[in-house]
């Protein structure tokens, strides 16, 4: 992809980012990472307390790219069929008909995904990894683009089922969506909690535009020195005395794709170290497990962030 083409295509993405920032106040970093996820063909896990705008983010993104949106509130009594769909017998036609579930959408908000059982959680694995679901030995393609934005509350642990490592590894990245600062919250109150802005949000792109951009991201050049840089960070997570579980090959692929998407959003057709460094924590933190050798006063959920930051600081940046 030529520099001119990269700039022309990424200009549309910049317009999309500006539109989302007008709705999601004070969370520019979360908006950027959500766009990195969709352009890198990945999925996003958001940790945050209720009421900070997670649902609004999903709705705004779907509306801005003129795509369908579904929200599923996960509970402990849900079944996989509540998400995927179910085959129902039709007496008139004397055959089973498949009734599609909410997963058949472009943007799926899986709200409080750790409130449901591992069986229901795992029903999303095939959808997230392969873009299809299998019910009663029949496979059904999901609409494209397909993005899962899952949320979980880091504070309320009662009655939750922590996501297993295999499920966490399917998410391109995990971000924390905390409280807005005072100025952003003032703007939210002035705009009636953002509802007016969401209602006035018009499509900036189409689903076809997003698919085109996903292909453009694949063509972003990554120098071999940057590949070595990323692999060195990955290697150190596997050898760290403070981590009982390092980053998997799927994780290293995720960082590579995310860095390409970051460069794309910056209007470049090539990656730099600055595309990789800020993504290490959001892409890797949920994939590693900190052991008891790491002495820290930080919360358990924040210790992985700190270990990764220390690893990045000690890896030489290519010039």
Question: Which residues fall in each region the model found?
Answer:
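Pre-Walker A (pre-P-loop) alpha-helix and adjacent loop at the N terminus of AAA/AAA+ ATPase modules
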Residues: 6-52
């Amino acid at each position: 992809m030529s520099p001119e083409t990269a700039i022309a295509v990424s200009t549309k993405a910049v317009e999309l980012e500006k539109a989302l920032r007008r709705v999601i106040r004070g969370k520019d970093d979360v908006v950027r990472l959500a766009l990195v996820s969709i352009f890198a063909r990945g999925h996003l896990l958001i940790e945050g307390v209720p009421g900070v705008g997670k649902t609004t983010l999903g709705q705004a993104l779907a509306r801005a790219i003129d795509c369908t949106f579904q929200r599923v509130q996960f509970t402990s009594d849900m079944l996989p069929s509540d998400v995927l769909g179910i085959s129902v017998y039709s007496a008139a036609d004397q055959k089973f008909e498949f009734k599609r579930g909410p997963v058949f959408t472009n943007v799926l908000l899986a709200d409080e995904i750790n409130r449901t059982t591992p069986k229901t959680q795992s029903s999303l694995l095939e959808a997230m990894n392969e873009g299809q679901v299998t019910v009663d030995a029949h496979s059904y393609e999901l609409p494209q683009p397909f993005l899962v934005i899952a949320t979980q509350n880091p504070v309320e642990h009662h009655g939750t089922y922590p996501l297993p490592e295999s499920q966490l590894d399917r998410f391109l990245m995990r971000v924390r969506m905390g409280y807005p600062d005072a100025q952003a919250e003032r703007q939210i109150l002035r705009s009636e909690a953002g509802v007016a802005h969401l209602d006035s949000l018009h499509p900036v792109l189409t689903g076809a535009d997003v698919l085109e951009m996903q292909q453009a991201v694949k063509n972003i050049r990554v120098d071999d020195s940057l590949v070595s840089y990323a692999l060195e960070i990955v290697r150190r997570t596997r050898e760290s005395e403070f981590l009982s579980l390092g980053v998997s090959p799927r994780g290293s692929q995720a960082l590579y794709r995310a860095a390409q998407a970051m460069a794309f959003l910056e209007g470049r057709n090539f990656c730099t170290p600055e595309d990789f460094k800020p993504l290490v924590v959001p892409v890797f933190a949920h994939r590693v497990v900190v052991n008891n050798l790491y002495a820290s006063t930080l919360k358990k959920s924040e210790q992985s962030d700190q270990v990764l930051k220390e690893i990045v600081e000690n890896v030489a940046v290519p010039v």
